[in-house]
From Swiss-Prot:
Keywords in alphabetical order: Ribonucleoprotein, Ribosomal protein, RNA-binding, rRNA-binding
A GO molecular-function descriptor: structural constituent of ribosome
Listed InterPro entries: Ribosomal_uS14, Ribosomal_uS14_bac/plastid, Ribosomal_uS14_CS, Ribosomal_uS14_sf
Lineage summary: Bacteria, Pseudomonadati, Bacteroidota, Bacteroidia, Bacteroidales
Function: Binds 16S rRNA, required for the assembly of 30S particles and may also be responsible for determining the conformation of the 16S rRNA at the A site.
Protein name as annotated: Small ribosomal subunit protein uS14
Domain of life: Bacteria
Entry similarity comment: Belongs to the universal ribosomal protein uS14 family.
């Protein structure tokens, strides 16, 4: 399980990316790369990393559900994810 500080850092980065998204797009369209460099580092969407919403795990992230593969398996086995069931053929 990830430290609370790591989870908080990712949330903070996501807020910064959202805050500067319009300004970043406008500067990029103008080709004003000097002004683009003056924006905060964490305002770049490249610095975001998907994390499990429950555990904060950075690897094995499933975009469709927003959780890691481990949490997905546990929740699917318990029947907590609608429309997901164990395959059998």
């Amino acid at each position: 399980m990830a430290k609370e500080s790591m989870k908080a850092r990712e949330v903070k980065r996501a807020k910064l990316v959202a805050k500067y998204a319009a300004k970043r797009a406008a500067l990029k369209a103008e080709g004003n790369y000097e002004a683009l460099q003056l924006l905060p580092k964490n305002a770049s969407p490249v610095r975001l990393h998907n994390r499990c919403s429950m555990t904060g795990r950075p690897k094995g992230y499933m975009r469709q559900f927003g959780i890691s593969r481990i949490q997905f398996r546990e929740m699917a086995s318990a029947g907590l994810i609608p429309g997901v069931k164990k395959a059998s053929w």
